Regions:
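Glycine-rich phosphate/diphosphate-binding loops that line cofactor/substrate pockets in enzymes
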Residues: 9-27, 151-160
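Short, highly selective alpha-helical patches that border small-molecule cofactor pockets
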Residues: 10, 36, 40, 44, ...
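Ferredoxin-reductase
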Residues: 21-98, 189-193
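Active-site phosphate-binding/coordination module
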Residues: 65-124, 195-214, 230
Length: 258
């Protein structure tokens, strides 16, 4: 489901999206760590020079923010550059059926991108624009927090079951979300511990995975577009059609095991 993040990948995606959309396309570019910024910016330059329009995420953020932005700005796709050197590729807008808008590209679609990459030649010869791309505003982060809080509040009509939690999450977004939901965050003596991978897609808790899935049973989507596996949960498919550990962790803290 991933590909090596490289300038050639951006060129291949540009070719793929141009063919899918029949013209100028919009691509969001997100990245996991500050060290990935230069590659993301180079990707934006390649996209602009290849007939597309690039929108860079405002800073290093978890992947669910990039997936969320695809739907919010009706982009035709997104690339998320991971710290591992791999890239997640999302499709949306005119490039995919509406039921899969904002979901990860299927293997068949990635194969077409691979073929486009193979036809691009060498990296040094790729055209690059000197500008033209935009930045996604910080307001997108607030919109994501608002949407998650609204979704979680809708899951528990009789009032939340709050528990003190401890949090390990690099971006700080989970703490912001928990504070919005009035969930106490503590350093010691927590009833529940929540740990999220830097890319924001995998949740590890002090509970076994089976108990997490039971607690989130009414929240989890059954959409075939969403990846499954230990630690991968999607609780808001209307906006993030991918594993979203941030939203899932906050939902677990509110819903508990009741």
């Amino acid at each position: 489901m991933t590909r090596c993040a490289s300038p050639l990948l951006f060129a291949g995606i540009a070719s793929f999206l141009s063919a899918r959309t029949g013209g100028r396309f919009r691509l969001i570019i997100g990245y996991e760590t500050p060290e990935n910024h230069d590659l993301a910016r180079d990707g934006a330059a390649i996209i602009e020079a290849s007939g597309g329009h690039a929108l860079l995420m405002p800073r290093a953020l978890p992947a669910p923010l990039t997936a969320f932005s695809v739907r919010m700005v009706m982009a035709d796709g997104a690339v998320y550059v991971s710290a591992s050197g791999e890239a997640l590729v999302y499709l949306g807008g005119r490039a995919v059926d509406r039921s899969r808008e904002g979901a990860l590209a299927l293997e068949a679609e990635l194969t077409l991108i691979d073929e486009a990459v193979a036809a691009c030649g060498d990296e040094a010869s790729l055209p690059r624009s000197q500008g033209g791309w935009e930045s996604v505003g910080d307001g997108m982060i607030g919109a994501y927090v608002d949407r998650c809080a609204s979704r979680i509040a809708s899951l528990e009509a009789s009032g939340p079951h709050l528990a003190s939690v401890s949090v390990t999450e690099a971006s700080g977004l989970l703490t912001i979300l928990l504070e919005r939901l009035s969930v106490p965050v503590v350093e010691e003596g927590a009833a529940l511990s929540l740990s999220i991978s830097t890319d924001g897609r995998t949740l590890t808790t002090s509970l076994p995975d089976e108990r997490v899935r039971t607690a989130l049973a009414d929240a989890l989507t059954t959409s075939p577009a969403v990846p499954t596996g230990t630690g991968l949960y999607c609780v808001d498919p209307a906006f993030v059609l991918d594993a979203d550990a941030l939203c899932a962790a906050a939902a677990l803290a509110v819903l508990g095991e009741s």
